[in-house]
Amino acid sequence: MTEAQRHQILLDMLAQLGFVTVENVIERLGISPATARRDINKLDESGKLKKVRNGAEAITQQRPRWTPMNLHQAQNHDEKVRIAKAASQLVNPGESVVINCGSTAFLLGREMCGKPVQIITNYLPLANYLIDQEHDSVIIMGGQYNKSQSITLSPQGSENSLYAGHWMFTSGKGLTADGLYKTDMLTAMAEQKMLSVVGKLVALVDSSKIGERAGMLFSRADQIAMLITGKNANPQVLQQLEAQGVSILRV
């Protein structure tokens, strides 16, 4: 067996198990302890595994986190672009919109930029973009900066209730007949305070999340005026939502 063949088998073991000991490698490949350690060292140096005490660990490849600079890497990017374009068509000149955080939110803000609408947001990447593009009317909701979500969050019972928009556009990690789910509790609670003062709540949810439950229930289905999603969304869930008065737009 060649060195390259040994390395491939070792990597296959890690892909399946996540961790192997030197003894595992010796037994599987029928090689000496010195050869097993040498193989692990070489693969560690080449960045293909992580050497640990008495063995090796697989290296988890994380999906790059999207930013406005690499927006094309956002999951289901093309569908989200269609969703954002459709959402922007709902808003009339002179109206105000609340746009929250996330890749779809940024895409929607980009579609709205330059139009005669007031944009209310706590999402700093979007706010910075709108200011840089000299959008006429931008309101940035104040509060403490949350690094993980790049947003500002206000204390409970703060002045967020003053920011009433004709429309509120938001996304989530899942949507079922029960309603819209979000995984970040602080973000969800901050947005929930605005539900009673906005005109219409529109959920922007790509088709992969329809039928999924993830995190906390942010809003009941009967609180959602409209859902904009992709054409591959679960039809059974869409029927259940329509039965509760939710308008469905598939793009």
From Swiss-Prot:
Q: Which organism is it from?
A: Salmonella typhimurium (strain LT2 / SGSC1412 / ATCC 700720)
Q: Which HAMAP family match?
A: HTH_type_UlaR
Gene behind the chain: ulaR
Its recorded name reads HTH-type transcriptional regulator UlaR
Identify the InterPro entries for this entry: Carb_Metab_HTH_regulators, DeoR-like_C, DeoR_HTH, NagB/RpiA_transferase-like, Tscrpt_reg_HTH_DeoR_CS, Tscrpt_reg_HTH_UlaR, WH-like_DNA-bd_sf, WH_DNA-bd_sf
Any Pfam family the entry gives: HTH_DeoR
Q: Which UniProt keywords apply?
A: Cytoplasm, DNA-binding, Repressor, Transcription, Transcription regulation
Pinpoint the HTH deoR-type domain residues.
Answer: 3-58
What's this protein's function?
Represses ulaG and the ulaABCDEF operon.
Q: What GO terms are given for molecular function?
A: cis-regulatory region sequence-specific DNA binding; ligand-modulated transcription factor activity
Q: Which NCBIfam families match?
A: PRK13509.1 (NF010034)
